[in-house]
Amino acid sequence: LYLRYLSKRESRELLEKLKKDFKLVQEFDHIIVSETVLKDKKIKIYIGVSSTEKIPLAIDLVEEFIPAIHALNKDLMKINYVKIDQGALPRILNGADVMAPGIVETSDFKINDLVGVREFERSLYIALEKLS
């Protein structure tokens, strides 16, 4: 595990990418990157630091850059979503794919979009899925 602060330029570039890709709505004083290796792949977790809190913002999986679910649930970013009913919730939490019968609401999205899976009652994100 390796932690470091991003330079001002690196932080600015990352925040611009998050604003463009995921509609980030909050500024941060600093960005920390945590680097680790998981199953022979280098993973980076970007953490936003403000005067009051530290929030995981995004995860760089080398082939894919995704928002952190915690940041989505704090409404710091916006992505397309599907809401699922309570009957589908345990299956999704155990790794099942999202199927049409469990979907009760959707936003506009296209094939190959990254879509957040939200539970219907509290509207919290529980998973991310790439549509194919």
Predicted feature residues:
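Accessory RNA 3′-end/elbow-binding domains used by RNA modification enzymes
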Residues: 1-132
